[in-house]
Amino acid sequence: METTLLFNTSLLLTLMILLTPILLPLLSTKLQNTPLIITTTVKMAFFTSIIPTTIFIYSGTEAIISHWYWSFTPNLKIPLSFKMDQYSMLFLPVALFVTWSILQFAMWYMASEPHVTKFFIYLLMFLIAMLTLTIANNMFMLFIGWEGVGIMSFLLISWWHGRAEANTAALQAVIYNRIGDVGLILSMAWLASTLNTWEIQQISYESQTPILPLLGLILAATGKSAQFGLHPWLPAAMEGPTPVSALLHSSTMVVAGIFLLVRIHPLLANNQTALTTCLCLGALSTLFAATCALTQNDIKKIIAFSTSSQLGLMMVTIGLNLPQLAFLHISTHAFFKAMLFLCSGSIIHSLAGEQDIRKMGGLQKLLPTTTSCLTIGNLALMGTPFLAGFYSKDLIIESLNNSYLNAWALLLTLLATSFTATYSLRMTLMVQSGFSRIPPITPINENTPLVINPITRLALGSIMAGLLITSNILPTKTPPMTMPTIMKTAAIVVTILGILLALELSNMTHNLTAPKQNIYSNFSTTLGYFNPLAHRLSSMKLLNNGQKIASHLIDLSWYKKMGPEGLADLQLMAAKTSTPLHTGLIKTYLGTFALSILILLTLTH
């Protein structure tokens, strides 16, 4: 009883602490927020959240559900239902820890910005929307969190709204996510009309769900988690401030799609078509994003494509019927991805906004803490043994090796893993080693604790998070006890091959001034020609067809046939028909009069 009371109290306290900076200014005009207050609030919420998470793990509880009804239709009751299970309780401290570090970094990065308090409030609301999504126990609450992260991402990506690129990127993010939202809304409509409920527990009992609502949910995850086909918004979102990129890519919006599939996984578990769709889509996404990252020169774009590649790996795990592993990768990925973005932000800020890695070099001596943490982050991303990424990434590739599913997906995933090592090492070498290629008057300084503390804190998380999480969670399925050495070491072998490939390419191209253009480098540089084809060609075709339809239907049909000209022609025809009758001869008029009388008499008698 005491344990339950402590759990409920500490969890409620965590949520109330988070809401305080938003609610207090509404109560009194004298209570004004500052970035420091908001950062301290998230820090306090993180330390408070450790208590319920620890109690939950060690009490052996499966789930705690609380709900109350909000009925605005007589047939469909929609409860405000919250579920504290393994996923939501572990995600809570991870998200708070990462957000605390990002907010502390933003106090330095955005110090000279006007309206900086509003920026921090937006980041906090972004986090709250994501936490609403994770603890939601029905599709209605999940949809509120889903749309919340969508609108907050739009506001944050377009924060520098004076720049046309930022506005375009924000619109792109919204439009691509609208496509995914169509799938979610249609699936929710099917669930409400067929099962008469949006409760996830009740939905999970449906053993044979048709493929169409499942494809709608997969489409929703494809849009939100930037899978192949709806991926261009993710690299474009780099136009926002770096703290936004760090929060968006680590623990909020982009993992919302994968989290949706983890939540509704009982529906997918028995449908092989849906699982195969997830597997193939994820394998294609992870390879395509890794291929695009190979030739990028913008440091933030490289990290953005690495996020897209890791999201593809999570989608592969959903396709393998292992949602717990996908969630484990979400948790470990949050630490090193946030750290990579904060390191890139520190470098960009120190170099007066320069993002091109070809104009960096030799930063190991100038920014030792930042570059050391950047190296740790890249090693964790590669899946280096005993760092955070290893505990999830290695397990995913082991499971893929041991599954009876499609070898094509396995080959694509292994190739993408190799490419991950290649572009990570390329970025590390070009940023940190070699001769310095930065202007000599650039003021470089990383002495402020607002930079060093969050980055080193996340570096510690990138080293220890995998071990801590896997030590406290038991796998839902028994892992294979024995397997061939080649299958066990496949992930590390392809990673080493990728590193060797990067070193060889670095040596080969060290003295080249202009690399030769070929079809493969052009494919990677132009992001697979996807943007010109999707944004230019298809838009031009749609606009031309729309113009033709409008001109033919409206101009020709309405104006010519049925509109003013049509009426004029009709009246002219009537006038021409009646004109010959008006001859001016008395005999004609008398004959017409007599004929009219005769017809009238015939009709009346």
UniProtKB/Swiss-Prot annotation:
<feature type="transmembrane region" description="Helical">
    <location>
        <begin position="116"/>
        <end position="136"/>
    </location>
</feature>
<feature type="transmembrane region" description="Helical">
    <location>
        <begin position="5"/>
        <end position="25"/>
    </location>
</feature>
<keyword id="KW-0830">Ubiquinone</keyword>
<feature type="transmembrane region" description="Helical">
    <location>
        <begin position="333"/>
        <end position="353"/>
    </location>
</feature>
<feature type="transmembrane region" description="Helical">
    <location>
        <begin position="140"/>
        <end position="160"/>
    </location>
</feature>
<dbReference type="GO" id="GO:0005743">
    <property type="term" value="C:mitochondrial inner membrane"/>
</dbReference>
<feature type="transmembrane region" description="Helical">
    <location>
        <begin position="483"/>
        <end position="503"/>
    </location>
</feature>
<keyword id="KW-0249">Electron transport</keyword>
<feature type="transmembrane region" description="Helical">
    <location>
        <begin position="371"/>
        <end position="391"/>
    </location>
</feature>
<feature type="transmembrane region" description="Helical">
    <location>
        <begin position="45"/>
        <end position="65"/>
    </location>
</feature>
<feature type="transmembrane region" description="Helical">
    <location>
        <begin position="302"/>
        <end position="320"/>
    </location>
</feature>
<feature type="transmembrane region" description="Helical">
    <location>
        <begin position="405"/>
        <end position="425"/>
    </location>
</feature>
<feature type="transmembrane region" description="Helical">
    <location>
        <begin position="242"/>
        <end position="262"/>
    </location>
</feature>
<keyword id="KW-0812">Transmembrane</keyword>
<dbReference type="InterPro" id="IPR018393">
    <property type="entry name" value="NADHpl_OxRdtase_5_subgr"/>
</dbReference>
<keyword id="KW-0496">Mitochondrion</keyword>
<keyword id="KW-1278">Translocase</keyword>
<dbReference type="GO" id="GO:0015990">
    <property type="term" value="P:electron transport coupled proton transport"/>
</dbReference>
<dbReference type="GO" id="GO:0042773">
    <property type="term" value="P:ATP synthesis coupled electron transport"/>
</dbReference>
<feature type="transmembrane region" description="Helical">
    <location>
        <begin position="449"/>
        <end position="469"/>
    </location>
</feature>
<dbReference type="Pfam" id="PF06455">
    <property type="entry name" value="NADH5_C"/>
</dbReference>
<keyword id="KW-0999">Mitochondrion inner membrane</keyword>
<feature type="transmembrane region" description="Helical">
    <location>
        <begin position="274"/>
        <end position="294"/>
    </location>
</feature>
<dbReference type="InterPro" id="IPR001516">
    <property type="entry name" value="Proton_antipo_N"/>
</dbReference>
<dbReference type="InterPro" id="IPR003945">
    <property type="entry name" value="NU5C-like"/>
</dbReference>
<keyword id="KW-0520">NAD</keyword>
<dbReference type="Pfam" id="PF00662">
    <property type="entry name" value="Proton_antipo_N"/>
</dbReference>
<feature type="transmembrane region" description="Helical">
    <location>
        <begin position="210"/>
        <end position="230"/>
    </location>
</feature>
<keyword id="KW-0813">Transport</keyword>
<feature type="transmembrane region" description="Helical">
    <location>
        <begin position="583"/>
        <end position="603"/>
    </location>
</feature>
<keyword id="KW-0472">Membrane</keyword>
<dbReference type="Pfam" id="PF00361">
    <property type="entry name" value="Proton_antipo_M"/>
</dbReference>
<dbReference type="InterPro" id="IPR001750">
    <property type="entry name" value="ND/Mrp_TM"/>
</dbReference>
<keyword id="KW-0679">Respiratory chain</keyword>
<comment type="similarity">
    <text>Belongs to the complex I subunit 5 family.</text>
</comment>
<feature type="transmembrane region" description="Helical">
    <location>
        <begin position="179"/>
        <end position="199"/>
    </location>
</feature>
<protein>
    <recommendedName>
        <fullName>NADH-ubiquinone oxidoreductase chain 5</fullName>
        <ecNumber>7.1.1.2</ecNumber>
    </recommendedName>
</protein>
<feature type="transmembrane region" description="Helical">
    <location>
        <begin position="89"/>
        <end position="109"/>
    </location>
</feature>
<dbReference type="InterPro" id="IPR010934">
    <property type="entry name" value="NADH_DH_su5_C"/>
</dbReference>
<comment type="function">
    <text>Core subunit of the mitochondrial membrane respiratory chain NADH dehydrogenase (Complex I) that is believed to belong to the minimal assembly required for catalysis. Complex I functions in the transfer of electrons from NADH to the respiratory chain. The immediate electron acceptor for the enzyme is believed to be ubiquinone.</text>
</comment>
<keyword id="KW-1133">Transmembrane helix</keyword>
<dbReference type="GO" id="GO:0008137">
    <property type="term" value="F:NADH dehydrogenase (ubiquinone) activity"/>
</dbReference>
